[in-house]
């Protein structure tokens, strides 16, 4: 199923975490739309700010390290410059050593891109993944996608 086929993903109200990111002139393609690289940068900004927010609001989780294992993107329409982008995020699923973030990019209340990103919890020492500690699992659960 495509991300856009889930009606929860098309409304910004179902995402528990939000931030507004301004667009830049350098984000524009020849057709005066936000280019695909800029769209991925906006998703990245959402992921980074969300994980930073988790560390600030849930000090018991410490400083977990995550790696992007997979990203899927649905482009629904063009993003516009100079309009700000409303980046919305929720936790779509929690596994034993990873979690899936559900992200949406909105302008003027309308979704123009959706993404799912699987984040793997990295082991503190050496290569490989590590189980999600209970404090981190609980913090992630607070941001479950409605």
Locate each region found by the language model.
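Catalytic strand-loop segment that frames the active site of acyl-thioester-processing enzymes
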Residues: 2-49, 53
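A broad, structural micro-motif
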Residues: 34, 66-68, 112
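Short, basic/aromatic beta-hairpin or loop at an interaction surface
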Residues: 58-66
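Helix-adjacent hinge/juxtasegments
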Residues: 65, 69-91
